[in-house]
Amino acid sequence: MQRRRRAPPASQPAQDSGHSEEVEVQFSAGRLGSAAPAGPPVRGTAEDEERLEREHFWKVINAFRYYGTSMHERVNRTERQFRSLPDNQQKLLPQFPLHLDKIRKCVDHNQEILLTIVNDCIHMFENKEYGEDANGKIMPASTFDMDKLKSTLKQFVRDWSGTGKAERDACYKPIIKEIIKNFPKERWDPSKVNILVPGAGLGRLAWEIAMLGYACQGNEWSFFMLFSSNFVLNRCSEVDKYKLYPWIHQFSNNRRSADQIRPIFFPDVDPHSLPPGSNFSMTAGDFQEIYSECNTWDCIATCFFIDTAHNVIDYIDTIWRILKPGGIWINLGPLLYHFENLANELSIELSYEDIKNVVLQYGFQLEVEKESVLSTYTVNDLSMMKYYYECVLFVVRKPQ
């Protein structure tokens, strides 16, 4: 039985407990809002917001539970279309129905893992409960939620599988290198260096930072990510114990049929192997609302994050306020704005040149800038189609 400790306040770095025994990574909830398919949390009375957040919590759990039904419908549709072909054409592909049966088995396995994840998340927040499911039965989930869930399965590849190592090396290593350079152990006590990772996803970057002894807190807004990161960080200790089939949803651009049904194994490391006395926690909620206390953080590390903003200047403003004087902001990522072209959504799409100008006008001092850091994001390494990003890496400092 792991010893539980109290999570830090959502707006402050955790304080070192001094205990050396293994502890759970604590998840504390700020305000997550209703999380409509696109857009910021809905504003209203406190009671309305609590109700909407509770409904969204159970809506995401329902999506995890509905996955198998949705995917079996997809496979059945493919089989019906195949059966509509002339007999002579079907006879050319005797292995095709067998391949679909293999996909069905992969779907069933994924569903088992997803049920395990959500069965463990009902009481995952140390400071919040969401009551009972009002529906009490599995309901059809939206296409939006199913797409989110499929994307979350690919996050396991990126963050916690051996398959994702090359992608992590491209995205996370440059950030970690800058942290080590700016806070060397010869001059800093790492446990006193407070580092925040907004948009933490499944938590691997924040975990790697905590592995180096720094006090690190990850922040994430998506319940899809939070449920999954809680499972990996707190319920997985045996290396490569679990497997998933993240590519079965991809029916195009497969060189071989076997590529579609190949598994990945996770976690590739023991998430419980943090050094004794490690100071690592996760918070759930809107980055801009949770983190309001000025001059709190020594370092803020953002990876594939700033383009998730409705207005990236709001992110810059928050980072400026919560960084300590002398603190640094490390950013790596592209500018694929998440709310671009969505109806009824504010979306300010700035070029990197504009963002840089705003950052400098706030008073940040530019120390590192690399404009062509090549990276992928949840890439299927055997796919016939891959997207590559030429990311920007910059390090800026808030003056003393």
Curated annotation (Swiss-Prot):
GO terms for cellular component: cytosol; nucleus. The Gly-Xaa-Gly-Xaa-Gly (GXGXG) motif binds the adenosyl part of S-adenosyl-L-methionine. The carnosine-binding region forms hydrophobic and hydrogen bonds with carnosine, defining a flipping orientation of the imidazole ring so that N1 is present next to S-adenosyl-L-methionine for methylation. S-adenosyl-L-methionine binds at residues 155, 158, 199, 220, 286-287, 303, 315. It is an enzyme of class 2 (transferase). GO terms for biological process: carnosine metabolic process; methylation. Carnosine binds at residues 307, 338, 389. Belongs to the carnosine N-methyltransferase family. Keywords: Cytoplasm, Methyltransferase, Nucleus, S-adenosyl-L-methionine, Transferase. Expressed at higher level in skeletal muscle compared to other tissues. This is Carnosine N-methyltransferase. InterPro entries: CARME, SAM-dependent_MTases_sf. Optimum pH is 7.0-7.5. It is found in: Cytoplasm, Cytosol; Nucleus. One of its GO terms (molecular function) is protein homodimerization activity. Homodimer. Each monomer accommodates one molecule of carnosine in its active pocket, precisely anchoring the histidine imidazole ring such that only N1 is exposed and deprotonated for methylation. It comes from the Eukaryota. Residues 1-49 are annotated as: Disordered. Its EC number is 2.1.1.22.
